[in-house]
Amino acid sequence: MSEGTIGTTSAKAAVYPGPAEGLARYKMVVEYNGTDYSGWQRQENAPSIQQTLEEAVEAFCGLQVLAQAAGRTDAGVHSSGQVVHLDLPEHHTPMRVMGALNAHLRPAPIAVRDVERAKPGFHARFSATSRRYLYRIQSRRAPAALDQGRVWWVPVTFNVEAMQEAALFLVGTHDFSTFRAAACQAKSPVKTLNELRVERAFS
């Protein structure tokens, strides 16, 4: 199943270590098609979004950096707005960083949509206050063609109203242990789901 994600961040009270001397922290919004990638995080024997972005940085300014993201998407998962931070030489303007990274990322299906100087203490992962996810299901007899790889095709119809009613049981704070992978690195399986909507996109 394909999953679209958006990582959203905003500043918390906590302050995290900043960049080294001569570097500045750049906050960026990254969009990618994760079909051919093992996920966000670097892997030893498979391409990842993180590795591809870090290699683009090295090609741009010669630095080996660690790209930090608001969330770690899994294999095959896309993002329309992953929040990332990079510590880069401070003399580069945000526009220069965006243009250079996009040039070095081509032809990979990864694009830097926006770049700005991060506020002091900002950290893409630990300053995140929420994350949003979009799951798309194509419900029809004919298989997916234009959206292949971006939807979960199911050749039956659904009762959307019943699905929405059932989804409400997941809203709130719950222990999601049965949903987490064996290698999950989250400190706690207890999470708060603020909103869950099941909607028919079109008929």
Which ranges hold each PLM region?
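Structured-RNA-binding interfaces characteristic of tRNA pseudouridine synthases
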Residues: 2-203
